[in-house]
């Protein structure tokens, strides 16, 4: 360019959000995968295998059963996981594969995959997971990512018809969109989804 040597590297930047894919194993069985891409922070890649075991990769590391991540996020025991997901066959198959049985073991197993070879302790694992996923300076879906996430997960349909236990705030302005006690109509649920509200109670 203008007499100077330059190297042009093309790069594909994917927008924050959640992406789904379906593949097939050698017998033609459908294998599902999804990737959660934040604006800033670790990617989460989910996939199923031919045995219906559900795995996750955190930031392109080696895969672990998804129940390891669930335990590390605070839902530690098999009973708590079953209470949350019901008798979902893929979760039951995954629990059979998962050697961890509680929160601390889940934390340690996940830490081993993310930081192989480093000294292992519950405190260091806890601090890593907290900083990776719960520190807004390190993990952020951004408004567009949150909007797309909510839209793909049909957030609107799941909250319509329910009564709010807490006020719903607009994450951009802090203003109250709907007050506690309101039973949400589809239009109100739409407003909440379009405002990229991360959660409601």
PLM features: residue spans?
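N-terminal non-catalytic structural scaffold regions of very large proteins
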Residues: 1-201
